[in-house]
Amino acid sequence: MRTHFMKNQSVKRNQHVSTPAIPASICADGLISELVHNEDHPGMTQLLLLPLLQQLGTQSRWQLWLTSQQKLSRDWLLRSGLPLDKVMQSPYCGTITTVEAMIKALQTGNYSVVLGWLADEISETERKRLQQAAKSGQALGLIMRSECNVLPSARPLHGLRIQSSLYH
């Protein structure tokens, strides 16, 4: 994951963000969604993801980032308006898959959102297990996938495909 930030696109920590409240039913029912992003245009991903993460940051629960590469920057988190005291990052660990880590984290109910960066498609069985875990923990699970890892014919289930080239 890259933690680049768009120039002149910072959010003051105590500034009110005018994003609509997340319906309680989303967290109560649990939800798994997938965001396919273009790593060459991290600003677009941030524009879509940050309002959601800022809203979830108002909850008493943690946000868990299961990343495979870079460490989250404290400065980036501050500029993004995300609560430092509620964001946890766990880098990829070879003993457990990211999907298994997401399932375990979602089940605990300790996290409002669990973001997992996955390189490969997941099976329908894994998706069902993730959905059940999200429902059990009343949490949101976000599968983050780079579009270079997605086959042209593959489409994310319950997700959003970002065609960054259309916006630039």
Swiss-Prot record:
Region annotated FtsZ binding, chain positions: 105-111
Disulfide pairings: none
Gene3D superfamilies assigned to the protein according to its UniProt record, in alphabetical order: P-loop containing nucleotide triphosphate hydrolases
GO biological process: division septum assembly; DNA repair; negative regulation of cell division; SOS response
InterPro entries: Cell_div_suppressor_SulA, P-loop_NTPase, SulA_CellDiv_inhibitor, SulA_enterobact
Site (Essential for degradation by Lon protease): 168
Conditions for induction: By DNA damage, as part of the SOS response.
Changes after translation: Is rapidly cleaved and degraded by the Lon protease once DNA damage is repaired.
Keywords per UniProt: Cell cycle, Cell division, DNA damage, Septation, SOS response
Pfam families xref list: SulA
Function: Component of the SOS system and an inhibitor of cell division. Accumulation of SulA causes rapid cessation of cell division and the appearance of long, non-septate filaments. In the presence of GTP, binds a polymerization-competent form of FtsZ in a 1:1 ratio, thus inhibiting FtsZ polymerization and therefore preventing it from participating in the assembly of the Z ring. This mechanism prevents the premature segregation of damaged DNA to daughter cells during cell division.
Family: Belongs to the SulA family.
PANTHER family referenced in this protein's UniProt entry, alphabetically: BLR3025 PROTEIN-RELATED, CELL DIVISION INHIBITOR SULA
HAMAP family, sorted: SulA
Subunit structure: Interacts with FtsZ.
Protein name according to UniProt: Cell division inhibitor SulA
Gene source species: Erwinia pyrifoliae (strain DSM 12163 / CIP 106111 / Ep16/96)
Name of the gene this protein is made from: sulA
